[in-house]
Amino acid sequence: MAQRTRLGEILRPLNSEYGKVSPGWGTTLLMGVFMALFLVFLLIILQIYNSSLILEGFNVDWGQ
């Protein structure tokens, strides 16, 4: 038998709608926002890697 946890009880309402299609756009807008934030995160990491984003006191030396 599966063990009940507090986290499981919190997440249960999300799983109760499994297999059903939300009317309209549903959570598409929220997904788009998170994708945009993830893109910004990746761009910042890329700029740090290319040293085009200079951070004071943070030396990036790849050839040790």
From Swiss-Prot:
The keyword Membrane applies. GO terms for cellular component: photosystem II; plasma membrane-derived thylakoid membrane. SUPFAM superfamilies: Photosystem II 10 kDa phosphoprotein PsbH. Keywords: Membrane, Photosynthesis, Photosystem II, Thylakoid, Transmembrane, Transmembrane helix. The chain crosses the membrane at residues 29-49. GO terms for biological process: photosynthesis; protein stabilization. It is found in: Cellular thylakoid membrane. Belongs to the PsbH family. This is Photosystem II reaction center protein H. It is a single-pass membrane protein. It comes from the Bacteria. Gene3D superfamilies: Photosystem II reaction center protein H (1.20.5.880). PSII is composed of 1 copy each of membrane proteins PsbA, PsbB, PsbC, PsbD, PsbE, PsbF, PsbH, PsbI, PsbJ, PsbK, PsbL, PsbM, PsbT, PsbX, PsbY, PsbZ, Psb30/Ycf12, peripheral proteins PsbO, CyanoQ (PsbQ), PsbU, PsbV and a large number of cofactors. It forms dimeric complexes.
